Amino acid sequence: MTIQVAFIQIIQALSPIHGDREAASIAHILMEHITGLGKMDRIVYKDRELTEDQADRFQKGLDALLRNEPVQYVTGTGWFYGMELQVTPDVLIPRPETEELAEWIIEDVKKAGKQPGNQETGLEMQGRILDTGKRIVTGLHPSILDIGTGSGAIPLAIKKNLPSAAVSAIDISAGALEVAKANAKKLSLDVNFSLVDVLDVNATAALPIFDIIVSNPPYICEQERAGMQEQVLDYEPNIALFVPDHDPLRFYRRIGELAQEKLAPGGGLYFEINEAYGAETVKLLEEQGYVEVVLKQDLFGKDRMVKAKKL
């Protein structure tokens, strides 16, 4: 079987399920994974025969796709903010909307670092902190915590683009943390990962103070299951997706409470949110005492992100 024949077979098999365009996109991803060749090279070498191993991986991959398994789980990889990450069924597949959340933080920190008065050295800042007994958010060397990190996509994107930041991340899933640590090692990025249940007050008590806390927590209500894609329900970890219908903001409430204890004065709290609860999330944070609460839409025009400032 040649590269071109294999590519066409994938499209023909998947088009009735996903449509021609999505089927072609999936075919490109799988064939690059199998052959190690980019799109242009696969065109040049379209008549090259697959090796026995490649043909076996092709058939296993196609069988998995026909079971509606996401191509990212089939290949074991997904892309986020220009980084190729390992993904397994222990973690959610990274999504473009979450890239926007990471970018918001990166841009804000870079802007803060350019403000007048923020050009002091790390030693000068450390001395000023010791003198006053308070943390000062300057944007130079922020300490950042990601809650519910999954594959580590958010903290790794932040660390890659803000190398002087001290970045930590927590998750309730040991399996997810294994994936996140593997991604950090592969990318040679220094992020501190810990097994912590954010809903457990005792477990979070030992966390230090941070300049920024970010989270993309579970936010899909159980009643929304009916409108979701089957492959998400069948393959992605439900623990990272769903919240009870009677308490859709449970994680935002808890993380907001935690951030009042663990955020430095002037620190920032960033969330990805359920588009149906934008106004409610803003109201919750304002009631918790946060100021400068901003609701932001994603590229699709949906309420998707919120940031707030601790006094």
What are these regions (language model features)?
Residues 75, 195-196, 273, 297:
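Short loop/edge segments at beta-strand edges and connector loops
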Residues 30, 68, 98, 154, ...:
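Residue-level signal for inorganic ion chemistry
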Residues 100-133, 137-227, 254:
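Conserved SAM/SAH cofactor-binding pocket of Class I
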